[in-house]
């Protein structure tokens, strides 16, 4: 037989403490201050030129990313100053009523510091040679670049006062299957 009384008391105290606005110690509150950074590579690009547009598939993937982020709170969207990254970032930024903010992919340590200091839930769109590197810098690991054929990774970095956790998601998106 399951004794339901302890759970009932726990639930009662949780509700009472929550509704009464009990002030927990400041250190406990600070540990709960959380923001999340999402890092993705730009979607499929047209050609090997310096600043190509997205392919039709890349446009579809960018719309799919927007749908993924519909239920995710974002306060900022960042992109490098290339058409392929801007094209990937814009659908999500527009759906959130945000402007795409630029960053320099050649200064990833500076970008990392600014993201941590900004303490905002944010999407950062980069490149195959910068996205994994930036994720690694954010969590203190050597992740490095990844192959140019990979477009389906979403790095999620959860930041609290005392910890930074990295989760890697793989999207199920396939071109032409919207």
Model-found features: residue ranges?
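Active-site-proximal alpha-helix that buttresses catalytic centers in soluble enzyme cores
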Residues: 31-119, 130-133, 137-178
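Noncatalytic modules at the cell exterior or secretory-pathway interfaces
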Residues: 121-123
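Hydrophobic alpha-helical segments and their boundary regions
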Residues: 7-10, 47
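Sec/Tat signal peptide C-region and signal peptidase I cleavage site
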Residues: 24-29
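Short beta-strand segments
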Residues: 125-127
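Bacterial N-terminal signal peptides
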Residues: 11-22
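N-terminal secretory signal peptides that target proteins for export/translocation
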Residues: 1-6
């Amino acid at each position: 037989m399951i004794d339901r009384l302890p759970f009932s008391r726990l639930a009662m105290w949780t509700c009472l403490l929550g509704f009464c606005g009990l002030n927990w110690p400041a250190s406990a509150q600070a540990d709960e201050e959380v923001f999340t950074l999402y890092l993705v590579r730009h979607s499929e690009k047209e050609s090997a030129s310096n600043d190509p547009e997205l392919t039709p598939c890349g446009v579809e993937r960018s719309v799919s990313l927007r749908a993924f982020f519909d239920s995710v709170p974002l306060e900022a969207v960042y992109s490098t100053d290339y058409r392929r990254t801007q094209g990937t970032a814009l659908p999500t930024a527009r759906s959130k009523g945000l402007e795409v903010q630029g960053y320099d992919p050649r200064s990833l340590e500076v970008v990392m510091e600014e993201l941590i200091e900004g303490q905002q839930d944010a999407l950062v769109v980069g490149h195959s040679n910068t996205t994994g590197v930036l994720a690694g810098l954010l969590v203190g690991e050597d992740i490095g670049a990844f192959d140019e054929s990979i477009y389906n990774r979403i790095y999620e970095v959860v930041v609290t006062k005392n910890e930074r956790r990295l989760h890697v998601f793989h999207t199920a998106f396939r071109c032409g299957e919207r």
